[in-house]
């Protein structure tokens, strides 16, 4: 059986007042062509179908048309909700849809939703696990200690019947410890959403969503498909793709990726004004940084004639750097040791603030040092 794995469509997303929907629709057409050329049997969509829990009608129509075309091609489709989606809205008509071979995760009811497919190698079980928080799982297992995201997922899997003699695929939208993130993903405080990859050892392939960079985690068959396109300038160096997974007999799983070609790339442009103006005209989404010491007042307008889809514009020179240094120094002088420590901790820990325990240790050390000085 061959299936395609994609995730994090974020249909309807906007950035700096630019709508991505037209690009997203064209990329979904590319996915259809890849499915056709690869002769895929199914498509797995691992969450964050929409950018918002209440998506705009145009985004919903785009997804409806995409799913309809996949079904016209004879593919089975599996969809779960992500942290950006409303599990209730995603699962509308799920009972009716499954009769057509479209399997949509329902709002979590304490059980792992499973679908059994059949091919020449026997049964293949696809399990659907929508994005979960500990509080959602705790109510179904009141006798268990469920504090972290890992506790929650482990509890669900422990109470589910996963027959390891069969081929098992899990579609999941969570954060795996060690995965490389970008600015466009939501983060929790202190890394509480981390889940160890070993939790999924019973599954032959784990189709992950949530992280926007395509990547494998500990093994080739535990993989983030990545987002449909670049959604922040922290992703400019990423190559977006679709994962194509072919499962033979138990233990025989092959994975390769097929690149996606966005109608407009997202990239950084930097240089002196005359250098930037000498660049070829481009409708890519760009962040332009000028290095001129005295750029003309209308530099932004001038640059937009070469880059009409310029999303951000900035000037970095000796003056702006000096201004930044002065402001930073003044800000530091007006901050308490606790605030300075918090800033440093955030810098070292992906913008996560220090917890109460860290602050208590800091205060204890301060008292100890102040006592020695006296």
Residue ranges with predicted function:
Residues 6-7, 43-48, 76-83, 103-108, ...:
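Active-site neighborhood of phospho(di)ester-bond hydrolases with catalytic His/Asp-centered motifs
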Residues 37, 42, 246-374:
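Accessory, non-catalytic peripheral segments of nucleic-acid enzymes
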């Amino acid at each position: 059986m061959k299936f395609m794995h994609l995730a994090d469509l974020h249909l309807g997303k906007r950035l700096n007042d630019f709508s991505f929907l037209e690009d997203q629709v064209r990329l979904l057409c590319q996915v259809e062509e890849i499915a056709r050329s690869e002769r895929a049997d199914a498509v797995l969509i691992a969450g964050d179908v929409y950018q918002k829990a209440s998506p705009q009608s145009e985004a919903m129509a785009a997804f409806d048309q995409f799913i309809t075309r996949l079904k016209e091609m004879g593919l089975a489709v599996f969809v779960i909700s992500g942290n950006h989606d409303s599990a209730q809205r995603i699962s509308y008509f799920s009972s009716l849809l499954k009769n057509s071979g479209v399997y949509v995760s329902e709002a979590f009811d304490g059980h792992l939703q499973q679908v059994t497919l059949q091919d020449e190698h026997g049964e293949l079980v696809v399990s659907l696990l929508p994005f979960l928080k500990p509080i959602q799982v705790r109510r179904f297992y009141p006798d268990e200690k469920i504090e972290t995201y890992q506790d929650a997922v482990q509890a669900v899997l422990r109470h589910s019947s996963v027959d390891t003699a069969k081929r098992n695929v899990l579609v999941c939208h969570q954060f795996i410890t060690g995965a490389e993130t970008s600015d466009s993903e939501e983060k929790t405080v202190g890394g509480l959403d981390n889940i160890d990859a070993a939790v999924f050892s019973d599954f032959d392939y784990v189709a992950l969503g949530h992280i926007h960079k395509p990547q494998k985690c500990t093994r080739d068959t535990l993989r983030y498909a990545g987002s449909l396109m670049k959604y922040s300038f922290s992703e400019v160096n990423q190559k977006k793709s679709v994962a194509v997974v072919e499962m033979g007999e138990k233990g025989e799983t092959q994975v390769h990726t097929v690149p996606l070609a966005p109608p407009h790339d997202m990239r950084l442009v930097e240089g002196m004004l005359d250098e930037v103006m000498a660049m070829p005209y481009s409708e890519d989404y760009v962040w332009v940084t000028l290095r001129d010491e005295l750029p003309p007042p209308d530099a932004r307008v001038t640059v937009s004639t070469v880059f009409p889809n310029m999303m951000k514009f900035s000037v970095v020179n000796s003056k702006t750097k000096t201004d930044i240094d002065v402001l930073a120094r003044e800000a530091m002088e007006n901050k308490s040791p606790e605030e300075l420590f918090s800033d440093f901790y955030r810098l070292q820990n992906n913008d996560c603030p220090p917890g109460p325990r860290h602050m208590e240790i800091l205060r204890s050390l301060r008292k100890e040092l102040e006592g020695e000085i006296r």
